A protein has these predicted regions:
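Short, functionally important structural connectors and interaction interfaces within domains
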Residues: 17, 24, 57-58, 62, ...
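Non-heme Fe(II)/2-oxoglutarate
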Residues: 31, 35-133
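Intrinsically disordered terminal extensions flanking catalytic oxygenase cores
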Residues: 1-55
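Catalytic core of non-heme Fe(II) oxygenases with the double-stranded beta-helix
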Residues: 117-218
């Protein structure tokens, strides 16, 4: 079990969240409470969250989530992790869809707890604003690595274990290639570091695009 070298990464707080996004989430919470109190008898109105979330395609969104400083710290921490924990594929998946990853709950519980806090306090309100649905218990939180040696691209798939996926690039600009393709909509170039791609992965056929050089961390 890996212990974080940078204690800031273990803090269950909002310091790592983009300021405008965090403010929008806080301003949206009363709207969510009001909607739930109406027990489905009224429509959900547009919220402050809708001002920071951009719809790329139907049901596919992007939003600035993490501060660049947090992503930079996490990349440095990953270099320490690799000395103690290997990136490994999920053997429950078929080989074409296996991506080298570190599952945080099993290997880095301190970081898992801080990311779980982000799901509860930031992402779940976003899911409520977009889809009027709670999704507070993540099936898995992991760090993935696309590279030429181990896995340069993914294959078309649906995520059977998750209704909603949140993919956050940690080091855009430090590799060539990458991005995400959606079967019905085309390709999306790598988002800026810390910006989240949010979509219902159970119903949207998608894949990671080839990395030409470097390590793409998500």
């Amino acid at each position: 079990m890996y212990q974080l070298k940078n204690y800031l990464l273990s803090m269950q707080s909002h310091w790592m969240i983009n300021h405008k996004t965090y403010q929008a989430v806080q301003e949206t919470l009363p709207d969510i409470v009001k909607f739930k109190g109406q027990q489905g008898m009224e429509d959900m109105s547009k919220t402050p969250i809708h001002k920071v979330i951009k719809k790329i395609h139907p049901e596919i969104y992007r939003v600035p989530l993490f501060r660049r400083k947090f992503c930079s710290m996490l990349i440095k921490e990953i270099e320490h992790m690799k000395k103690e924990i290997p990136f490994e594929a999920n053997t429950d998946e078929d080989q074409l869809r296996q991506i080298p990853e570190i599952v945080l709950r099993e290997h880095v519980p301190e970081l898992y707890r801080s990311m779980w806090f982000v799901v509860q306090s930031v992402l779940n309100p976003m899911f409520n604003a977009i889809w009027q649905r709670d999704c507070k218990d993540p099936s898995t939180i992991q760090i993935a690595n696309y590279n030429l040696k181990d896995k340069k691209q993914g294959a078309w798939h649906h995520d059977e274990s998750a209704d909603i996926s949140v993919v956050v690039p940690l080091n855009t600009g430090k590799y060539k290639g990458g991005g995400t393709a959606f079967h019905n909509y085309g390709e999306i170039s790598p988002l800026p570091t810390g910006h989240a791609l949010i979509f219902p992965s159970f119903i949207n056929l998608h894949k990671g695009l080839p990395v030409e050089s470097g390590d793409r961390y998500l």
